[in-house]
Regions:
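Positively charged n-region of N-terminal signal peptides that target proteins for export
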Residues: 1-4
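Bacterial N-terminal signal peptides
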Residues: 6-16
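A flexible loop/linker signature enriched in serine peptidases of the S9 family
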Residues: 21, 41-46, 61-66, 78-90, ...
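Mature N-terminal segment immediately following signal peptide/propeptide cleavage
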Residues: 22-53
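Signature of short aromatic-glycine-proline-rich micro-motifs recurring in repeat-based ectodomains
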Residues: 27, 154, 302-311
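Residue-level detector of Asp-centered blade-edge/turn motifs that repeat once per structural unit
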Residues: 32-34, 72-73, 116-117, 162-163, ...
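Compact, basic/aliphatic-enriched, mixed alpha/beta core segments that act as assembly/interaction modules
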Residues: 242-244, 255-257
Length: 362
């Protein structure tokens, strides 16, 4: 009887813990290695089993951590953080621990990939970019050192094809542009670099989004909005131009995909999916996050910390300010500020005070 009661209480405790954690959504930048996924949520890094479950927070620093990438052996986690101002590359044990900063270059740094042997981290940066707005790709040792530029004129994404001494890369654009059906001069295309032949070969010819190249299972996987205009996963054999759809979403885009060569993890409709490369099985996993939801709490905010534009008139006796979507009239001497708009559901900006101080245009 006592044993049955103990088992019942244990099950009750586990069930209560599962209920206490809400299923999260709007995750970004997931990375996968075998049975572990790390992602960004509430500007921190979290870890969860690849089959889903309760996530564990890995970082708590007030700055933002994103662009995480698990190392090829799964022991290390590289990511971008804004701990000391400009975004920089950091590395820490994948189980959690003290981050170590690896880059100090101007122009920021966003982690893109690991080299296949796990000795270096590839990142993109405006460092050394004299003309233009496209970043370059660099590598830095896992123990630090001077960054080394990859043999490209420019680049934003990369995926290695180690068995052929090649890598796939995107030369331009930003994969985070959410312009639908964009076909302008900054659309992303995918190229192949051969380190032996020193050649650069275009892989895609679709005028539109060709992004996130990934090498897995002897094929190139990538994201494209060809077809219905929604970004989906596609596969393509190198040496051909024939792309086959893997996912066929018609509502929300496939975003932030990453592969460890066996599985592809991505976000769609704010939720995490895992695609098994060998079988083609695609599963949306349930991620419960035990967050305290601190960002959703009601709190008192001083608008002076959010002043954006200002105007002065009435002989310098008064000023109008725009802060957090409202317009305020503030005396330049003593006296209280007055919220002239007070519309929490509408944003007002660029206020201008009339010469007599009686009317405000915005």
């Amino acid at each position: 009887m006592k044993r049955s009661l103990s088992v019942f209480l244990a099950i009750l405790v586990i069930a209560a813990a599962a209920v206490a954690a809400d299923e999260g959504r709007f995750f970004t930048y997931p990375t996968i290695h075998n049975d572990r996924i790390v992602f960004t949520y509430e500007s921190d890094l979290w870890s969860v089993d690849a089959k889903g479950g309760v996530a564990a927070r890995l970082t708590t620093f007030p700055g933002t951590e994103n662009f995480a990438k698990l190392s090829p052996d799964g022991k290390w986690l590289a990511f971008t953080a804004t701990y000391d101002g400009a975004p920089a590359v950091y590395v820490m044990p994948s189980e959690g621990g003290a981050p170590v900063r690896l880059t100090y270059n101007p122009g920021g740094a966003q982690v893109v990939a690991w080299t296949p042997d796990g000795s270096e981290i590839v990142f993109r940066s405006m460092f050394e970019n004299v003309v233009g707005r496209d970043p370059n790709l660099f590598s830095v040792g896992v123990k630090g050192g001077a960054p080394v530029r990859l043999p490209l004129d420019r680049g934003v994404l990369v995926s290695f094809v180690p068995e052929k001494h090649q890598f796939l890369f995107c030369r331009r654009g930003n994969e985070e542009y959410y312009w639908k059906r964009y076909k302008g001069g900054q659309y992303q295309d995918i190229w192949l670099y051969d380190a032996v032949a020193k050649t650069y070969t275009p892989v895609t010819d679709y005028v539109g989004k060709n992004s996130y190249p990934m090498w897995a299972g002897g094929l190139m996987y990538f994201v494209s909005d060809r077809g219905n205009g929604i970004s989906n996963l596609y596969t393509q054999k190198l040496g051909t131009k024939d792309a086959a759809p893997v996912t066929k979403y018609g509502d929300f885009d496939v975003m932030f995909p990453h592969t460890d060569g066996r599985s592809i993890v991505y976000v769609q409709d704010g939720r995490i999916h895992v695609l098994d490369v060998a079988s083609g099985a695609d599963t949306r996993i349930s991620v419960k996050d035990p967050s305290d939801r601190w960002a959703l709490r009601d709190r008192v905010i001083n608008p002076k910390d959010y002043i954006q534009t200002a105007g002065v008139a009435d002989g310098g006796q008064a000023a109008v300010l725009a802060a957090r979507g409202d317009v305020f009239r503030v005396p330049t001497g003593h006296g209280p500020a007055e919220n002239l708009s007070g519309t929490p559901g509408t944003r007002e900006m660029y206020p201008a005070l009339s010469p007599d101080g009686k009317t405000v245009a915005f």
